Swiss-Prot record:
Protein's name according to its UniProt entry: Lipid-A-disaccharide synthase
EC number: 2.4.1.182
UniProt KW keywords: Glycosyltransferase, Lipid A biosynthesis, Lipid biosynthesis, Lipid metabolism, Transferase
Keyword flag Lipid metabolism: yes
Catalyzed reaction equations: a lipid X + a UDP-2-N,3-O-bis[(3R)-3-hydroxyacyl]-alpha-D-glucosamine = a lipid A disaccharide + UDP + H(+)
An example Gene Ontology molecular-function term: lipid-A-disaccharide synthase activity
GO biological process: lipid A biosynthetic process
Family: Belongs to the LpxB family.
Top-level taxon of the source organism: Bacteria
């Protein structure tokens, strides 16, 4: 380094996926310049990476209009906490990770107080509210986007933008071989395994986990020797799922962390929508994506969203590689039937794996966090 002046960086990640990506960025930035200081909103991974979290991201992880309204007090207090810091002691840089509505309000505050803004992982302007690109252009100094098809949206609006690859391309790696992983989870290698991925938000657990368990009950009746495994998100505790699990009567192996080891032992996975579908795609595991929100949220979204798919892995592919069951279609019968098709039809499962390999190719070759860390240092006027 040519400069040793310490810089204070506010970083905001409102969800579990943002916590993961933020942690990778912070680790890489601190490797390049250990004098940097990070604080803001994050979860356990960002804290472990060295971020002082003023607000825990688990308190912010809600989705949908009705769901946000139910948590408006917590979200408002978090905003006021960060706003006060920006006003009273402005950071040298504000890094925003996804979480668009909250983060764009914070970007306005930063702009008024002369704080540079880097937006890492773009709001989904290509999916809905495309007019936000112009607002972003007024409020954000630099975009670091993770999908190549996002670049033209910002270039057309004159927003400085860099395609940095997808951070998951660096991280989605099992820690051991499949046989070893099966043994470590206490699973029988001679019996098939279905993964249950109910999400990282408590709202998702309440809305989606019951139907996931009901579909698992149907699968157990159809395939008596089937095994189930559930990786518990870092934003949740055993208490969030234990009552529903106990009521289901199912024998489910629950583990925390090691999510990629879990994925690789699965023959198929039932999952909520979101970043996790990309992780599963990178592991090449056939999946069924389910999506349920309040009727109001869904009806509003149907009128605003401009893409043909809910699952980000299908959006990246540009076609339906894996089935999506939305709202009333996300019934236990339909979920069990789609998983059963994977288990009963090896050719169909193999075709799905080939489609997921195409998604993996489009996500880039790795090095994302390092590239974003380089942008951070550049915006701070530092050199590596």
């Amino acid at each position: 380094m040519t400069e040793n002046t310490s810089h204070r960086i506010m970083i905001v990640a409102g969800e579990a996926s943002g916590d993961l990506h933020g942690a990778g960025l912070v680790r890489e930035a601190l490797r390049l310049d250990p004098t940097l200081s990070f604080f803001g909103i994050g979860g356990p991974r960002m804290r472990e990476a060295g971020v002082e979290t003023l607000v825990d991201s688990s308190e912010m992880a809600v989705v949908g209009i009705v769901e946000v309204l139910a948590h408006i007090g917590v979200i408002s207090r978090a905003f006021m906490t960060l706003r006060q810091v920006i006003v009273s002691n402005p950071p040298d840089l504000l890094i925003l990770i996804d979480y668009p509505d909250f983060n764009m309000l914070l970007a306005r505050v930063a702009r008024r107080h002369g704080v540079k803004v880097l937006y890492y992982i773009s709001p989904q302007v290509w999916a809905w509210r495309t007019g936000r690109v112009k607002t972003i252009g007024r409020l954000v100094d630099r975009m670091a986007v993770v999908f190549p098809f996002e670049v033209p949206f910002y270039e057309r609006a004159g927003v400085p933008v860099s395609f940095v690859g997808h951070p998951l391309a660096d991280r989605v790696r099992p820690t051991m071989g499949r046989d070893e992983a099966l043994a470590s989870f206490g699973l029988d290698p001679g019996r098939r395994v279905v993964g249950l991925f109910p999400g990282s938000r408590r709202g998702e657990i309440a809305k989606l986990f019951p139907v996931i368990l009901e579909s698992a009950q149907q699968l157990r009746e159809r395939y008596p020797d089937i095994q189930f495994i559930l990786p518990l998100a870092s934003s949740l505790t055993d208490g969030d799922i234990a009552p529903l699990l106990a009521a289901s009567g199912l024998d489910v192996t629950v583990t925390q962390d090691r999510v990629y080891d879990v994925m690789q032992v699965c023959d198929a996975i039932i999952t909520v929508s979101g970043t996790v579908t990309l992780e599963i795609a990178l592991m090449g595991v056939p999946m069924v994506i389910i999506y349920k929100v309040s009727p109001l949220t869904y009806q509003v979204g149907k009128r605003l969203i401009r893409v043909d798919h809910i699952g980000i892995c299908n959006i990246v592919a540009g076609e339906r590689v894996v089935p999506e069951l939305i709202q009333d279609d996300a019934s236990a019968d339909r979920i069990a039937a789609e998983i059963g098709r994977y288990l009963d039809d090896p050719a169909y499962a193999e075709k799905t794996r080939a489609g997921l390999a195409m998604v993996k190719e489009k996500l880039g070759t790795g090095g994302c966090s390092e590239r974003v860390a380089g942008i951070v240092l550049e915006m701070l006027g530092k050199q590596v």
